[in-house]
């Protein structure tokens, strides 16, 4: 497990336990901005999860389209779900 994923899991846990209180949301936005600056593939993969958690469905879908492995069934399924959300919700 990489450092980005560890940090995401911790922030996600805080977000869910506090039911999205402002401090946990701010921490996620700060982490999102940090990941957006990184060129690391692992950071981009975690960024998809952060976008999804923060309801940036369109951004999550577009990023996963760019970096996702289309031969992986799990990725294809997630792309389908995110595409539906992106079309109906946007960001």
Language-model segments: what does each one mean?
Residues 19-29:
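Helix-turn-helix repeat elements of alpha-solenoid scaffolds
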Residues 61-71:
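TPR/TPR-like (Sel1-like) alpha-helical repeat modules
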Residues 19, 42-43, 72-79, 90:
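Boundary/linker segments of alpha-helical solenoid repeat arrays
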Residues 3-10, 39-44, 74-75:
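Generic helix N-cap/helix-start motif at coil->alpha-helix transitions
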Residues 27, 31-34, 67:
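Alpha-helical solenoid scaffolds that mediate protein-protein interactions
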Residues 8-15, 48, 65:
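Conserved small-residue packing positions in alpha-helical repeats and bundles
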């Amino acid at each position: 497990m990489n450092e980005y994923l560890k940090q995401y899991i911790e922030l996600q846990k805080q977000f869910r336990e506090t039911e999205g209180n402002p401090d946990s949301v701010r921490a996620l936005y700060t982490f999102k901005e940090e990941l957006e600056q990184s060129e690391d593939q692992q950071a981009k993969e975690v960024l998809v999860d952060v976008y999804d958690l923060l309801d940036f469905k369109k951004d999550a879908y577009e990023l996963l389209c760019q970096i996702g492995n289309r031969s992986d069934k799990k990725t294809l399924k997630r792309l389908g779900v995110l595409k539906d959300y992106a079309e109906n919700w946007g960001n």
